[in-house]
Design a protein with these regions (language model features):
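Active-site nucleotide/adenylate-binding loops and adjacent lid/helix of ATP-dependent enzymes
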Residues: 107-196, 200-203
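ATP-binding N-terminal substructure of ATP-dependent carboxylate-amine bond-forming enzymes
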Residues: 1-109, 113, 135
Length: 203
């Protein structure tokens, strides 16, 4: 693993971004305003980020030759979203500094791990229960009450991979629809708005 803590970028440096979606596009536009170039790595043709990036590599995340070339042309590497294979991040970490680290990426890929990480660091989260089968879901509903939200632990984004439960009757259908994997049940929280924040820091 490369030592990441001492890296410093100056305008003109190239930031490698894994993923070519809307978040990659917004990151590339913001980086350009600061004088940085972005190299997008994505398996998708005609991705949103590719239209504004300095360079785009179109290849599978498992293509090590393409990943190596991508790393050689980047000064630092990051991701536009969390569903990047861990193996890809670990491979690239041997070649260039990768932020956030693959260990943090792994946490962000599982909602249960995210909740535990937050609570372990003193951050309050919505009351929740991990569930791996329908019996556990029924117990969780009795504990947390309804309305509640059933969410897949992995591959959920932009409202996908989740169902609002109004009672036990709706729980059965939701479980059959979503639970091909572990899930979490969250107590429903009334809210006025949702805020997304990207945080960066220097050394």
């Amino acid at each position: 693993m490369l030592e990441n803590s001492k890296i410093s970028l100056s305008p003109g440096a190239t930031i490698g971004i894994l993923g070519g979606g809307q978040l990659g596009r917004m990151s590339a536009l913001a980086a350009a305003r600061l004088g940085f170039r972005c190299h997008i790595f994505t398996p998708e043709n005609n991705s949103p980020a590719s239209h504004v990036a300095f360079k785009t590599t179109i290849a599978n995340y498992e293509d090590q030759d393409a990943l190596r070339s991508f790393a050689n042309e980047s000064d630092v590497i990051t991701y536009e979203f969390e569903n990047i294979p861990i193996e890809t991040a670990l491979f690239l970490e041997q070649l260039k500094p990768v932020y956030p680290s693959p260990s943090i990426l792994a946490i962000s890929q599982h909602r249960g791990s995210e909740k535990k990480f937050a609570t372990d660091h003193g951050i309050r989260v919505t009351p929740y229960e991990l569930v791996t089968n329908y019996t556990e879901l029924e117990r969780a509903i009795i504990k947390l009450k309804t309305p509640s939200i059933l969410k897949t632990c992995r591959f959920g984004y932009d409202g996908k991979g989740q169902e609002k439960l109004s009672d036990l009757n709706s729980a059965k259908k939701a479980w059959e629809k979503l639970a091909t994997q572990d899930a979490i049940l969250e107590q429903f929280v009334e809210f006025e708005k949702e805020i997304s924040v990207i945080i960066a820091r220097n050394n």
